[in-house]
């Protein structure tokens, strides 16, 4: 939004409050919906509950660098092979790729919304090394974390954010 000079303090305060409110609304929406993008696949109630449980377990363990498909299957209560088969059937994604996808989407969210350096984000989402995180991020988003941050840091366009996190 552009303003003509001289600018009234009330107009400036109003514009800032509106921009902050819009940013908070988008932030809250995408915090809740960050791991969506698999929901458009038709699932019965039991499958939906399983998918919700799997995603919740992954999010709970997102900072754990040792979290693996074996640990996920143990927490879900089914064999690794059966969990792999179910997730492929329900969401068309393997458990390891689902874990990586959720971690990388959370990393993207942190890079856009927090003033946190890239190494810190890598550890917050469960990557043990900065280089592995950067390579995985580049493979997933098609750009480095630094390029991503530069491009989307002040983005408030809902459609663009939906493409990133959807």
Predicted regions and their residues:
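Basic/polar phosphate-binding segments, predominantly the helix-turn-helix DNA-binding elements
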Residues: 69-99, 122-147
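CheY-like receiver
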Residues: 23-53
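Terminal helix-turn-helix DNA-binding modules in bacterial transcription factors
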Residues: 89-128, 150-166
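Basic, amphipathic alpha-helical hairpins
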Residues: 55-67, 87, 91, 108-117, ...
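C-terminal output helix
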Residues: 7-16
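Short, hydrophobic alpha-helical segments
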Residues: 16-24
